[in-house]
């Protein structure tokens, strides 16, 4: 957002058609953004394209998958014209299985307590810091948060993780799964706290018009920029 003094905040150009125009140049660097939508609306594709466009510019990117194994994810994404497996082979896009990370940390319990959350945050931020990640996607934050004991712990987890990632200069997309019923009453997350903690909210969905199903993308919230 441009101030009276002419200040313009640096942007992370998403490279996604139409989105950068809406955001006046991209997502403000270091933001944590919720990408919310119901099943099949393109959330995972949005997140992967966000990483690919960064990798094309030589950025180190990371994808933490909690909903499907990384092998299956990569097999599915090969169909898209924008994706090139060479980016994975060269280490520009790094894909991590959350289940493997849980096992490595010894987090075998059904639900996570405060100590578990701190261990998980440290593991994620250590990976970001070691690789020099500037773009990160967690898909989905909903699946991850189902393992956290309480709403307050979810809030603490997301706030602390977002703050640390921002300090490291990492722009983050948190994929949020919502039902069509919730999307109709302006709820962009499953737990009701994710949207308050996030710097931005991008909503994906579809709507029927004259017998045709149309896809839409809406920026509901984005701190630091007009939209």
Predicted regions and their residues:
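Substrate-engagement module of ASCE P-loop NTPases
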Residues: 124-125, 147-180
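Flexible beta-alpha connector loops of hexameric P-loop NTPases
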Residues: 6-9, 102-118, 144-155, 183-186
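Amphipathic alpha-helical transducer elements in NTP-driven molecular machines
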Residues: 12-16, 20, 29, 44, ...
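Conserved P-loop NTPase
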Residues: 2-10, 121-122, 126, 130-131, ...
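Helix C-cap/helix->beta junction micro-motif
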Residues: 57, 131, 167-169
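The Walker A/P-loop phosphate-binding site
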Residues: 1-83
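Conserved inter-motif catalytic segment of the P-loop NTP-binding fold
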Residues: 59-143
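Phosphate-binding/switch region of NTP-binding enzymes
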Residues: 170-227
